[in-house]
Amino acid sequence: MSLSIDVTSLPSISSSIYKNESSSTTSTLSGKSIGRSEQYISPDAEAFSKYMLSKSPEDIGPSDSASNDPLTSFSNRSNAVKTNADAGVSMDSSTQSRPSSNVGCDQVDFSFNKGIKVSANLDSSVSISTNVKKEKSKNDHRSRKHYPKIEAESDSDDYVLDDSDSDDGKCKNCKYKRKYFALRMRMKRVAMQLIEDL
């Protein structure tokens, strides 16, 4: 099995952040302009902290939720994505905050030179031979433990005791008294062997 991958040139991603007005740039892949500009509002963290600390926990309602506070709304706005009719892709990868006086523009350009070429060749052959050996070594027979055989009689109706029998485990008037005691002795031997093995 052989797998060859030719990666002469991986996809190159170039990202540039401009602080001035957004300029229309053309992507080498789609031919569409990508870019955006937006006025950012810088929050006053000190005023927000004073505002939240001045309120009691009982007075905090839905209007004071995390999505409405100035810090989170600023974060949502700074990470927003805007597209227009000419734009194919627009994204914001910058984590730094912008001052309120400047206009931010993030531009991402994707260029694929040769792409990735994959050539895979798979050669496999499977051969299965099924030869069963019927000869067993004598050591296998010696190592195997032999348990006493228990023969089950088909005529179980003949083992039913009559009314004169006692319930103490002794069979006095059984039709097959000798077979009963032999079977009971075998069962005892099997039970003792199992206990020893455990």
Curated annotation (Swiss-Prot):
Residues 16-30 have a biased composition (Low complexity). O-glycosylated. Hyperphosphorylated on serine residues, when in dimeric form. Phosphorylation by host CK1 is required for the hyperphosphorylation of NSP5 dimer. GO terms for molecular function: ATP hydrolysis activity; magnesium ion binding; nucleotide binding; RNA binding. Residues 16-37, 53-104, 127-167 are annotated as: Disordered. One of its GO terms (biological process) is viral genome replication. InterPro entries: Rotavirus_A/C_NSP5. Mg(2+) binds at residue 92. Keywords: Glycoprotein, Host cytoplasm, Magnesium, Metal-binding, Nucleotide-binding, Phosphoprotein, RNA-binding. Its cofactor is Mg(2+). It comes from the Viruses. Residues 64-82, 91-104 have a biased composition (Polar residues). The modification Phosphoserine is found at residues 67, 154, 156, 164, 166. Residues 153-166 have a biased composition (Acidic residues). The keyword Transmembrane does not apply. GO terms for cellular component: host cell cytoplasm. Signal peptide: none annotated. It is found in: Host cytoplasm. Homodimer. Interacts with VP1. Interacts with VP2. Interacts with NSP2; this interaction leads to up-regulation of NSP5 hyperphosphorylation and formation of virus factories. Interacts with NSP6. Participates in the selective exclusion of host proteins from stress granules (SG) and P bodies (PB). Also participates in the sequestration of these remodeled organelles in viral factories. Plays an essential role in the viral genome replication. Participates, together with NSP2, in the formation of viral factories (viroplasms), which are large inclusions in the host cytoplasm where replication intermediates are assembled and viral RNA replication takes place. Orchestrates the recruitment of viroplasmic proteins such as capsid proteins to these factories. Participates in the selective exclusion of host proteins from stress granules (SG) and P bodies (PB). Also participates in the sequestration of these remodeled organelles in viral factories. Belongs to the rotavirus NSP5 family. This is Non-structural protein 5. It comes from Rotavirus A (strain RVA/Human/Japan/K8/1977/G1P3A[9]) (RV-A). The lineage of its organism: Viruses, Riboviria, Orthornavirae, Duplornaviricota, Resentoviricetes.
